[in-house]
Structure formats: structure tokens, C-alpha cells
Amino acid sequence: MNPYAQYNPQERKVAYFSMEIGLAAELPIYSGGLGVLAGDTIKSFADLGIPAVGVSLLYKKGYFHQEIDTSGNQIEIPVAWDPSEYMTLLPEKITITIEDRTVIIQAWVYDVKGIKGDSVPILFLDTDIEINASQDREIAAYLYGGEERYRLKQEMVLGFGGVRILQLLGHDNLEAYHMNEGHSALLTLELMDRLQDIETVREMCVFTTHTPVPAGHDRFPKDMVREVFGENFDVESLDHDNIIDDQARLNMTYLALYHSEYINGVAKKHGETAQKMFPEYRIDAITNGIHTRTWVAESMARLFDRYIPSWPNDPSALRNALNIPREKIWAAHTAAKQELLDFVNERCGLSMQPDVLTIGFARRAAAYKRADLLLSDTDRLIKLVDTHGPIQILYAGKAHPKDEKGKALIKAIHEKMDAIKDKIDICYLENYDMYRAKLLVGGVDVWLNTPLRPMEASGTSGMKAALNGVINLSVLDGWWLEGHIEDFTGWRIGRRQRDEGEEPENSRKKDAADLYAKLEDKVLPYFYENREHWLDMMAYNIALNGSFFNTHRMVSQYVMQAYFQ
């Protein structure tokens, strides 16, 4: 029997394409928020019984294992893992043409089981087949590895190959092809080749953009596209509607926009930003969410089970968290905090204590996220501690191997850590992954987020923290513009928006000053002197933000607004 037949491909209605999908720490095929969002989305598909199928690439050499040396330099170590331990290799194979060579593609299927027993299969495409040329076997080896040409080949495998494998496996009744960012935009060309009708293709295509600035969108030189696509593809046919830009580059975002009936940003503010970037298209907004069962700490889950038993099926029921006795919330949080600190103390050689205010900052180490803002004035930080009480600081995050600014940021943080370590316990946890992320969002007291506005399209780590009753201290950007109620769900850093044309360095100084003021006037006094209000804020976070910012709500919006209009 064909192992894929159990998934009833004829009944699947939604195909969800993503360059990366984060499902569990042991599967090193994601790098950050985009992939984790994709994984959480598919988990909610399964929980809600949405007849979907996922499509991505299989990165046999994974995203890297991170080590940091004593000088703060990031060291990237390839990850060896065996997909056969987690997935089933399907017998079916398809071909695409790359540089006028035939490339054979196989697929591995991973089974995502929902809470009620429904399954969503994910097809991970793989070119590591003996008959392929050596350079083609490596196409899907590394996530976000290689140069532009390598990336274009990966996107061909995902877009062209993804549609072809779906057809071969019997997915004849798909009604929606959802592109999670522009990496999979080439699927629109494959659909056009098959259907020969732009309106039919548009009715089937949904495009979610995550990038709030023009520079972040994938572009490939037209001459390179011509060479890689091969002589049978007419690149000039794409030279319309900004798909080929004024620098003769294929713009994957415009390719997806042109072919999609429904387009959305990932938060209300980001939807407005995207609408200004692409005024010729109608851009909606569906704010991101998180998969609650994946991200809630075990101790907090047990608390919810007792007081809100319907929460796993209906996260909106978490609004009833206001009725949970505050001492029970604190006990559950303390258990999660102790689990985190045990992990940290063992790895960092520290003796962090559960009664000390603990601040967490963990996310991709990109320069715009300004992870070092908290350490920009170490003298003031030490004075705060001497005056108002101790703090503990936890950092984590990988920089992309080619992101020199991100690597420099990690190094700068380590240099600042050396300056304060005698006064403040501080640790940069190596090899940030989903396991460490869950410990951190469940166990710290304050979740810090300091991006340069308006660079944060949404962000989801703060949602995970809020679900666990952890209080956010964040720049007003992305989702926090919707989740923030000052002194109730957390605190804002800086003004609502950056002044037009304001230099980043000036914005940095203002935000740093406001961050220290919030620590001095609100965070430390509330934690050490007004625990009753602190506990109320924890409950408000769960009830107001945990109940709304979840992928069950998000997926329901996609179903109603995008997939089955």
C-alpha cells in the first residue's frame, strides 16, 4: 500500500508552503520566527481539522549548532541528523529543470497529529539522490546557505517541485495555495503553466508577507534567472507589474503579489506598512499567533487544566484566567522559573536564584533587534540594581552565518557582560532552539524586546511569554501595538513611533533612557514592593493576550478570509 494514501490527498483543500518549518528542537530545519510560525500554524491546522498539507525543503545538514568562544565569537558547527528517524521517505519522485539539467526530487512525509486525532502531512522535498549531479544533491542541504544562485535553486525546488509533487500524490482538489513569505512564489508560475488562466490562479493563491522594509524581499538578477531556469523559460514574459524591477531583478514578492487574490501582513501595523509599500494591491492584516499547547510551560498547563479545562481545544477560554487565584499563578510560574534556572546554572556555571527579578531576551541575533540596548549604559544599570534590588539577565540567539553585524552584536554583548558580571548574574545561552525558547518564555519574569521601529513586522516570542504570565517590556512595534496596555499587560519602551527621518542612533539613545526609566520607576518597584499588582499583571497577560494571540484564532481567520471565501 502507498504510505501516503492514509492522508486522503483528494480531500485536502489547503497547501501551505514555507521555506522553513519549526516543529521541534530535534528537527534542525528552522532558523527563527518564520519557521516556528509555520510549525505552529500546521499544528493548529491539525487541531482544528483543517484539510491541509504542508510543503517545505529537507535540510539534511540543517541549520547550524552554535557555540560561542570566550571572546564572544559565534562558531557555527554543521548539524548531522537522520530524517528517517522522524519521517517516511515516499517512493514517488518528480523532476524539474535547473540550468538545463534534469534534477530529481523526492519527498519525505512528516505527520503532524492534532489533539482530536486529525493529521496534517508535511512534504519535505529532497534532492540528495545518487542519480543527481553532485551540485544538485546539495541544493536542499543547508537552510539559508550559499549565495543568490543557490537560494534561487532552492526556491525552484520549493515552488515548481512542490506543486508537481502535490499533483503526483493525488492532491487534485486543492482550493488554496498559501505562500508563507515570497520564497515559494515560483509555485504561481507552475500553476499558470498548468491552468493557463490568471484569474483561476489568483483565486487559488494566498500570500503572507512578513517583511516591513523593501530591502528584505528576495530579488534575483534576470540574467541569473535566465541561466538557472534554462533555455525553455521565457524570462521576458515576467517583465510587467514590477515583477522585474528597474535593476533587472526578479522580485519574488511582486511575483507573489501579482498572482494572489488574498494578501496579508502579519499584524495590524504591518498591514498598514505593507499597504504603503504596495499601494497597487489590497493588503489585509491577520495578526500572527502561537500554538498554545506547544509554548505553555508544563506547570502552567497543569494550572490551566485545573481552572480552565477547555483551554487546549479553545485557547480563547484563557480569558477566564482572571478567576485563577493569584497565588496559584505565582506557584506555577515559580516552578517554571526554577526549571529554567536549573538549566541555566548548569550550563553557565552560575547560581541564579528564583527570588531575583529575571529578564529574558532571546531571538535571532539581527542588528535591528538591538539586543544590547539593555547594556548600553552599564554604570546606570549597576546603579539601578544597587538602589532598587538585584536582577538576572538571560540572552540567547543565533546570528545568520553571513550576518557580520549580528555576530558583532553577540560579541559586543559578551564584552558588556564582562563589565557587569561582578554585580549582575548574566548569561548568553548557546545554541538557541525551540527547547531553550520554551524554557525562557515560561521561566523569566520580564520579556524584553527592543527592535528599531518599524522593523518588527509582528514578533511572536512576546506572545509566548504572555501566555505564561510573563510580563512584556517592549518597544511599541509589531504585535505589541495590539497587546500592550500600560501597567496591565506590560510596559512600552519609547514613543509610539519613531520620528520621520530620525537617525537610528538618536532613537537608540532615547529608547535606552526610557528602558532604564521603566526599570527604575515600574519594573523593579512592582516586583519587589508591589507583588499584588505584579500578579494581577500576570493574570491580565494570560487572559487578554494568551487568549487572543494564538494560531487557532489566526488559522480561523485565514479559513474565513482567505481560503474558502
Give names to the regions the model predicted.
Residues 1-565:
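Catalytic cores of carbohydrate-active enzymes across secretory and cytosolic contexts
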